[in-house]
């Protein structure tokens, strides 16, 4: 009989644009989402925390390598409770979820602050297959050189302990400046 050591680990990588102008669409790309443990994890999730400087518009779920059903939930700045955006999604399919404020029925001063994919129990080796994306727009009125920091994390429980990983992405907002040239007499 051979006793295998338990190895736990999870990963996520988030990328996006280095620069953006106010009002410009932004696409965040998520990769390397996986349970790299050699054991199953409970309450497995991956989450994106959206900064105040962006407005969520659309989510492309990606697909995953183990047959499960999962849900996508979100929080807003006016509620600490999760609301369900989509439920009973199949990990073998890619879904495009409309998440514009009007579609979600948000108040004028309300915005999505967090989106979370909730999978439950995943086996060792659970991983994304097709890439998930989150689309947002830089809010208008942002100052030149404003920094937008977006944080994604992934995690799961093993024997009551959270196994987690974090990825951050920085986008600098720049505003267009109009330069008036002097008129010449010619």
Segment roles from a protein language model:
Residues 1-11, 136-186:
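Extracellular/luminal low-complexity Ser/Thr/Pro-rich, glycosylation-prone repeat/linker regions
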Residues 16, 32-34, 136, 154:
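Hydrophobic beta-strand positions in extracellular immunoglobulin-like domains
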Residues 45, 49-114:
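A surface/secretory-pathway sequence property marking extracellular, secreted
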Residues 7-9, 23-27, 41-43, 112, ...:
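A general secondary-structure signal for short beta-strands and their flanking turns/coil
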Residues 1, 30, 95-148:
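Low-complexity, intrinsically disordered segments enriched in Ser/Thr together with acidic residues
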Residues 18-50:
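Short beta-strand elements of extracellular/lumenal beta-sandwich folds
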Residues 11-17:
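Short, compositionally biased P/S/T/A/G/V-rich stretches that sit at domain boundaries
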């Amino acid at each position: 009989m051979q006793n295998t050591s338990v190895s736990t680990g999870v990963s996520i990588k988030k990328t996006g644009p280095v620069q953006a102008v106010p009002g410009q669409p932004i696409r965040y790309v998520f990769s390397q989402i996986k349970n790299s443990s050699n054991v199953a994890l409970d309450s497995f999730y991956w989450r994106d925390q959206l900064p105040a400087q962006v407005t969520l518009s659309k989510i492309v779920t990606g697909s995953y390598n183990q047959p499960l059903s999962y849900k996508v939930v979100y929080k807003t700045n006016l509620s600490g409770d999760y609301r369900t955006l989509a439920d009973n999604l199949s990990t073998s399919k890619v879904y495009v979820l409309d998440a514009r404020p009007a579609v979600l029925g948000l108040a004028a001063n309300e915005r999505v602050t967090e989106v979370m994919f909730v999978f439950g129990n995943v086996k060792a080796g659970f991983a994304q297959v097709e890439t998930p994306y989150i689309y947002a727009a830089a809010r208008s009125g942002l100052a030149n050189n404003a920094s937008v920091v977006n944080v994604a994390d992934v995690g799961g429980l093993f024997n009551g302990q959270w196994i987690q990983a974090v990825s951050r992405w920085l986008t600098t907002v720049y505003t267009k400046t109009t330069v008036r040239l002097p008129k010449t007499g010619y």
